Structures are given as C-alpha cells and as structure tokens.
Amino acid sequence: MTTLDPAIAGRLKRNPDGLVPAVVQQHDTGEVLMLGWMDDEALARTLTTGRATYWSRSRQEYWLKGETSGHVQWVKEVRLDCDGDTILVKVDQVGAACHTGDRTCFDADLLSGADRPGPDARG
C-alpha cells in the first residue's frame, strides 16, 4: 500500500465511496481522453510510479492503465481543481485511451454544439 501525502489527502473532497473523478487529458494537445476514478491509494500510486492508476468501480479493484492492453498512460502532470473535488491528469497516451479501442472516450456521440452559432454570430 502506498501512502498519499497528508497535505494532498487533506485537500481532496471525495464522494461517499471515497472516490474523486479524474479527467485525463493528452498533455501536449489538450485532447480529453477519458474520465476515471481515484481514491487516495490510486492517486498515490499514480504520483509515485508516473503511470496512471485508477479504481475500477465495476471490478472493485485497482487498474493500472495499459497493464493488459499495452495502452499505457505516462503521467506528465497532475493537478487538483480549485474545489478539491476533481483531479486533472495530463498524460502521454500510448494507443487507445478508451476500452472500445478509440483514442478517446469522447469521440463517438456529439450531443450538441456543432450547429450552434458562435458569439460573433448572435448579433
């Protein structure tokens, strides 16, 4: 078990299951890759090893990204948002980030936005 720095742990606002959402972004392009969940142990492992580790809510176990698929996330930067309730993990993604085999989990369904006018078109 890896211990999270108490100064970091004290800033986290966890959900009732002890988890914090982690938004994962490609470090050099800003592309949003996925959303994972971390508890203190997953965050400590991520900070210590330089590889992204998450808590799998479905399997109820730690998940080292790329351990079985080879689609590793090399961590470049980790930030905590202003409220302490969301983690931003900037990574160098090797291969697909999504379990579907897509590069990102956010490229399949556009719900809204593509046909909306920008601020200059409102008049």
From Swiss-Prot:
Alphabetized UniProt keyword annotations: Amino-acid biosynthesis, Cytoplasm, Histidine biosynthesis, Hydrolase, Magnesium, Metal-binding, Zinc
GO MF assignments: magnesium ion binding; phosphoribosyl-AMP cyclohydrolase activity; zinc ion binding
Family to which this protein belongs: Belongs to the PRA-CH family.
Cited HAMAP family: HisI
Cofactor comment: Binds 1 Mg(2+) ion per subunit. Binds 1 zinc ion per subunit.
UniProt name for this protein: Phosphoribosyl-AMP cyclohydrolase
Cofactor: Mg(2+); Zn(2+)
Any one GO cellular component localisation term in the record: cytoplasm
Biological process, per Gene Ontology: L-histidine biosynthetic process
Record gene name: hisI
Annotated InterPro entries: PRA-CH, PRib_AMP_CycHydrolase_dom, PRib_AMP_CycHydrolase_sf
Domain of life per record: Bacteria
Function: Catalyzes the hydrolysis of the adenine ring of phosphoribosyl-AMP.
Compartments reported by the entry: Cytoplasm
Organism field: Nocardioides sp. (strain ATCC BAA-499 / JS614)
Subunit (UniProt): Homodimer.
The enzyme's E.C. designation: 3.5.4.19
Residues the record lists as binding Zn(2+): C82, C98, C105
Pathway membership, UniProt: Amino-acid biosynthesis; L-histidine biosynthesis; L-histidine from 5-phospho-alpha-D-ribose 1-diphosphate: step 3/9
Pfam families: PRA-CH (PF01502)
